[in-house]
């Protein structure tokens, strides 16, 4: 395949007549739902908002958990603002949310979708008291096609973002987020991945990983990379056959919920 065949569609302008968010009517800000003594912190993915984790959060709250979710810096506003944030800012917000939840709960589980899963891994390296990790389509490594696009254009000062090709799929879901992938944010994700890969051996918590067979965003070996690096004695891996990247919102949502709750109850019993 020659370079012309994989040349991505690019955006070199930050000005658009269209709203920057898919499904702007959804609730996408921070939330904290008081429940029992067991807490769950849920972290959304890159370019998304907390709308991504709300259906999962509701199920946890219905089961009696205290549930928290935080909007990462640069999200829920404009892609331009996301381009001016970095991974350390994302981590700082997650640390603050975890500390606040820990004050109110005797046991805390941390979960995340995609980049949120990588941020959950970071928290686990800093907080061995975290009871378990729930990783949904963790973005430990990007799919090769997405990496090619990123590496081809990242050196260009004229390119701002790469438009997403999965917009139609996400329009049909209760998903909220940007219609483009800002390149600077993508670079921050790559740096976050590299940081976490070096720290995986510090993780001992039980881990549940749920991945999607039709995921075209992250490398399908991401879960295996995580399992090869961590020290966790309890680890489970499950695959959703008909789902795409946002596995916590796709058509096998009920199976994701069932698998998650079974794992959590086993850990907390």
Feature names for model-found ranges:
Residues 134-144:
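Active-site nucleophile loop of the alpha/beta-hydrolase fold
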Residues 112-116, 120:
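Gly/Ala-rich beta-loop-alpha elbow adjacent to hydrolase catalytic centers
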Residues 241-269:
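Catalytic active-site module of serine/aspartate enzymes centered on a nucleophile-bearing elbow/loop
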Residues 203, 209-211, 215:
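Short beta-strand/loop motif that positions the catalytic acidic residue
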Residues 56, 205, 219-228, 239:
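Short alpha-helix in the alpha/beta-hydrolase fold that links the catalytic acid
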Residues 61-79:
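Conserved alpha/beta-hydrolase
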Residues 28, 182-199:
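Active-site nucleophile elbow and catalytic-triad environment of alpha/beta-hydrolase enzymes
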């Amino acid at each position: 395949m020659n370079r012309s065949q994989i040349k991505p569609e690019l955006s070199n302008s930050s000005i658009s007549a269209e709203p920057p968010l898919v499904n702007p009517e959804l609730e996408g800000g921070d939330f904290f739902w008081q429940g029992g003594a067991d807490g769950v912190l849920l972290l959304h993915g890159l370019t998304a908002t907390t709308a991504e984790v709300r259906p999962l959060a509701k199920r946890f709250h219905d089961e009696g958990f205290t549930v928290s979710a935080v909007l990462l810096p640069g999200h829920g506003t404009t892609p331009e603002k996301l381009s001016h944030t970095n991974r350390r800012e994302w981590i700082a917000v997650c640390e603050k949310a975890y500390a606040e939840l820990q004050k109110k709960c005797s046991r805390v589980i941390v979960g995340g979708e995609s980049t949120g899963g990588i941020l959950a891994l970071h928290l686990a390296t800093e907080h061995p008291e975290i009871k378990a990790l729930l990783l949904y389509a963790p973005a430990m490594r990007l799919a090769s096609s997405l990496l090619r696009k990123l590496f081809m254009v990242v050196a260009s000062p004229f390119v701002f973002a790469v438009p997403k090709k999965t917009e139609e799929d996400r329009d049909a879901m209760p998903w909220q987020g940007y219609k483009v992938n800002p390149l600077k944010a993508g670079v921050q994700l790559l740096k976050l991945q590299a940081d976490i890969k070096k720290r995986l051996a510090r993780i001992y918590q039980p881990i549940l990983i749920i991945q999607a067979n039709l995921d075209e965003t992250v490398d399908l070996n991401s879960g295996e990379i995580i399992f090869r690096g961590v020290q966790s004695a309890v680890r489970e891996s499950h695959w959703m056959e008909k789902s795409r990247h946002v596995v916590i919102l796709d058509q096998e949502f009920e199976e994701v919920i069932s698998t998650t709750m079974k794992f959590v109850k086993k850990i907390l019993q």
